[in-house]
């Protein structure tokens, strides 16, 4: 990606709607309440023939230095300093407010090139707001409707004019574009399109050099953002005593011992009964999307109050989604009798989460940076197991021995016949067993096979899928017709 744009402006002018439009997916929370976005997030974006990175930010707000709003503003100021140019968004329908004027001055002081974006220009009465926008001193406003996708060709042209063609087009694009003429009508579908979807890929064999996607989840205030900030070595995510500070799922790039990592911090996931606000419901849905984007999910538990009902519900959700879980017992620096507490936590992990027997769990202190290398070693090992593939020959040699030792029980006086097994997928490992009467197979025997697979082929701590089907015998039943 050749350049970076920061989308900034006062709260509730449509910054996240524009962000979603450019990246092609609903990655940022959008609601009518001001201050929905609290952290800055970076993602690949596309606007016709322009490919770049875009930063969505918290609304610029005046606030006391020690308040949550002040920390949000600091995040936005950091985004401006990181970007090559700024898309300063105003609400053309509402017109220019004192907050717009104040923070337009802050953007001017940064010295960064600016495109003044007049959003909601499709609304009745927006013309007056458009004219008022000239008083901000940021140049001619570019009218758009981020919600409806109107004005995107004009925005594209404004960005190119601002930064220049040499800056906005990467070298490979310059070679490709030598014989091309840009026409928005011809490529009108290319706003936010063709951004690589992390989950829309063929499942490959395990590759230790491939970037690893990790989501970090847990109850509110378990220390998720503190852990990521420690990993990154910067205050990238908001932290503080207020529960539920993180509302969006925020991604950040990291490298651990040469391995490229994409981290997803998520909103704290509360019990449904406590999710009162519409906004918080949106946040939980956003966290679910982050889990689906991830490969390994680190479940952050507060070691001082672990394994509450909500912790187990989160773990169960991750397992049902087929992701590879790893537990981080955070705030370990607050534990006194560590050896006894750790033994108790391991026992509870095995007892409360038997569906992923052997689940890896590591004590850490996100605030002090203790145990992070050990945690990551377990994350990488779990990811490797999650990608494991076993040959059909090995599976069936094992299955033959299992049946000889413990055959399936007889049902209604008829013994069930198990014929063969094959692995049909990885991520998580999935197997199919061919047998005579799948509907009659007791679930206890299915669990017996899964536990045997886990132990024999060394697959602790990951979900294992096993399904049953009848043998594909085209001549089945013909013998009865013979006379």
Swiss-Prot record:
Signal peptide feature range: none
Superkingdom to which the source organism belongs: Bacteria
Binding site for GTP 2: 218-225, 265-269, 330-333
Keywords: GTP-binding, Nucleotide-binding, Repeat, Ribosome biogenesis
Protein residues bound to GTP 1: 9-16, 56-60, 119-122
GO molecular function terms listed in the Swiss-Prot or TrEMBL record: GTP binding
Domain KH-like: 388-472
GO biological process assignments: ribosome biogenesis
Occurrences of domain EngA-type G (ranges): 3-167, 212-387
Residue ranges crossing the lipid bilayer per the database entry: none
Family the UniProt entry places it in: Belongs to the TRAFAC class TrmE-Era-EngA-EngB-Septin-like GTPase superfamily. EngA (Der) GTPase family.
Record note on quaternary structure: Associates with the 50S ribosomal subunit.
Stated role: GTPase that plays an essential role in the late steps of ribosome biogenesis.
NCBIfam families: GTPase_EngA, small_GTP
Listed name of the protein: GTPase Der
Gene field: der
């Amino acid at each position: 990606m050749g350049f970076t744009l920061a989308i900034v402006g006062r709260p509730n002018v449509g910054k996240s709607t524009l962000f979603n439009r450019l990246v092609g997916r609903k990655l940022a929370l959008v609601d009518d309440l001001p201050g929905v976005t609290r952290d800055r997030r970076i993602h690949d974006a596309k606007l016709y023939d322009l490919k770049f990175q875009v930063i969505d930010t918290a609304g610029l707000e005046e606030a006391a230095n020690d308040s949550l709003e002040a920390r949000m503003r600091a995040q936005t100021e950091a985004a401006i300093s990181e970007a090559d140019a700024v898309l300063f968004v105003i609400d053309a329908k509402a017109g220019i407010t004192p907050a717009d004027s104040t923070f337009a001055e802050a953007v001017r002081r940064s010295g960064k090139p600016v495109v003044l974006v007049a959003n909601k220009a499709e609304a009745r009465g927006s013309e007056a707001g458009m004219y008022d926008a000239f008083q901000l001193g940021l140049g001619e406003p570019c009218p758009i409707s981020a919600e409806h996708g109107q004005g995107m060709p004009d925005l594209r042209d404004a960005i190119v004019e601002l930064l220049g063609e040499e800056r906005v087009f990467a070298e490979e694009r310059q070679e490709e574009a030598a014989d091309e003429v840009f026409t928005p009508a011809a490529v009108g579908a290319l706003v936010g399109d063709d951004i690589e979807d992390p989950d829309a890929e063929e499942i490959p064999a395990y590759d230790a050099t491939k970037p690893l996607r990790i989501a970090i989840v847990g109850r509110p205030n378990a220390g998720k953002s503190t852990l990521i900030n420690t990993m990154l070595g910067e205050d990238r995510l908001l932290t503080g005593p207020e529960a539920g500070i993180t509302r969006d799922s925020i991604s950040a790039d990291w490298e651990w011992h040469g391995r490229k990592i994409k981290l997803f911090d998520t909103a704290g996931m509360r019990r449904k009964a406590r999710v009162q606000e519409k906004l918080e419901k949106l946040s939980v849905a956003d966290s679910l999307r982050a889990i689906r984007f991830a490969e390994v999910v680190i479940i952050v538990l507060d070691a001082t109050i672990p394994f509450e009902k909500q912790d187990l519900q989160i773990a169960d959700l991750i397992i049902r989604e087929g992701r590879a879980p790893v537990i981080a017992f955070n705030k370990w620096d607050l534990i006194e009798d560590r050896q006894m507490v750790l033994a108790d936590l391991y026992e509870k992990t095995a007892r409360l989460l038997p569906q992923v027997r052997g689940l890896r769990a590591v004590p850490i202190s996100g605030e002090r940076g203790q145990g992070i290398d050990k945690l990551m070693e377990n994350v990488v090992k779990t990811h490797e197991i999650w990608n494991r593939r076993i040959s059909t020959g090995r599976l069936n040699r094992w299955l033959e021995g299992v049946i000889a030792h413990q055959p399936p029980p007889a049902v209604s006086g008829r013994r069930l016949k198990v014929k063969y097994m094959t692995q049909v997928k990885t991520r998580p490992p999935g197997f199919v067993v061919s047998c005579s009467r799948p509907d009659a197979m007791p679930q206890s025997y299915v669990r017996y096979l899964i536990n045997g697979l886990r132990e024999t082929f060394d697959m602790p701590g990951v979900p294992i899928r096993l399904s049953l089907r009848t043998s594909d015998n085209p001549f089945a039943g013909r013998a009865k017709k013979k006379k």
